[in-house]
């Protein structure tokens, strides 16, 4: 999006990196013809940026970048956009996947400050390992009531405020746009430190299968798929 895209443009190495912000969810390509797809500003911009053209005139030798990195938020919306993009690449740019040119960025989920040290955690398990199981998130600290006056046995609110006296803070990143350019570079864009996952044909086939099941016209199959996987779903409500 524009927020993370703006930070990314400020953070990038201009000699080797280009950033293409995608606003919102891209077009549902399940039923879209090539001409309708190219009427979408986002897909048209992506095709131009890649340089390969699309459809019958696709030419991988004209590919302008050898690492195409999908960077989305670590939430349900981000996963949806990532699935849309993987499906687009699988159906219309498959040689890019076969050639090992498509990657998924792995931004951190948490920023942990311990005194003057800064650590980044990419999972809940890593957060617990660095900060400890009981370390409160900043959002939890901000929502706490002020310490009540008086003496005696601490109340639950007082007990929760003990964390304020410890030089430890844990911030959860809900999206790439929450990072400033320096953080985005350090964690997600610096070739020396970033973590990338190479997209394989199997990954793209899985994304395409799920996309086809959920966005296609076979309603009974979609209902059956949703019912069988309902317990595995992660929902933002």
Language-model-detected regions and their locations in the chain:
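Conserved phosphate-chemistry cores used by DNA topoisomerases
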Residues: 2-237
């Amino acid at each position: 999006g524009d927020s993370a895209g703006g930070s990314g443009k400020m953070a990038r190495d201009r000699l080797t990196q280009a950033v293409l912000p995608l606003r919102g969810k891209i077009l549902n390509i399940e039923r879209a013809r090539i001409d309708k797809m190219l009427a979408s500003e986002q897909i048209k911009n992506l095709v131009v940026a890649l340089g390969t053209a699309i459809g019958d005139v696709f030419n991988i030798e004209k590919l302008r970048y050898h690492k195409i990195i999908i960077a989305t938020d670590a939430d349900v919306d981000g996963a949806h956009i990532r699935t849309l993009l993987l499906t687009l690449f699988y159906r219309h740019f498959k040689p890019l996947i076969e050639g090992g040119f498509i990657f998924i960025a792995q931004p951190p989920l948490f920023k942990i400050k311990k005194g003057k040290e800064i650590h980044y955690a990419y999972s809940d398990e890593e957060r617990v390992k660095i900060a400890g199981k009981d370390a409160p998130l900043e959002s939890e600290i901000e929502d706490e009531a002020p310490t009540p006056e008086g003496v005696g046995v601490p109340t639950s609110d007082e007990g929760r405020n003990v964390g304020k006296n410890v030089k430890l803070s844990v911030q959860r990143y809900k999206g790439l746009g929450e990072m400033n350019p320096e953080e985005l570079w350090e964690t997600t864009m610096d070739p020396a430190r970033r973590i990338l996952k190479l997209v394989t044909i199997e990954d793209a086939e899985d994304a395409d299968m799920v996309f086809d099941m959920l966005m296609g016209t076979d309603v009974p199959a979609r209902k059956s798929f949703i019912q069988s996987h309902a317990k595995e779903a992660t929902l933002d409500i």
